Amino acid sequence: MLNENVKKLLKENMWDLATCSAGVPNVVPVALKDVTDDGKLVVGDVFLDTTLRNLAATDGRIAVSVYDAKTLEGYQIRGAAEHVTDGPVVATFKTMVEQMFQGAATAKGALVITPETVIVTTPGASRMGPAPAFCTCLKSLKLFCV
């Protein structure tokens, strides 16, 4: 599903994760992330409490935004997220976080995101229509749905 351009952008830039529950959106920037060989997106869970609550309330529905600030190339990836608390991905994030925060924090788990739709957000590019449930949440705040 993810072509090489999308994977490259995901590996080289920070992401924004968007979730929504009860009409209230939540967006968080993430730097502790990776793309697996099979095209799944993984995010270290350090401070994702609201994100996890929203995912539990919406069957794991999530959107990930990534873009290059210089070229304006960008993508939105929509899919389903699963929270895992053990395994090699979690161990990798735990080591990374403990080193980064010098033992003051640790990863509680990881989100494993299975992409379902990729939308080009690069200015001037053609794109797909909005997902109704996610846009309903955004429209409640009078925000534009791409």
Regions found by a protein language model. Give the residues of each.
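Binding-site signature for planar aromatic cofactors or substrates
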Residues: 1-146
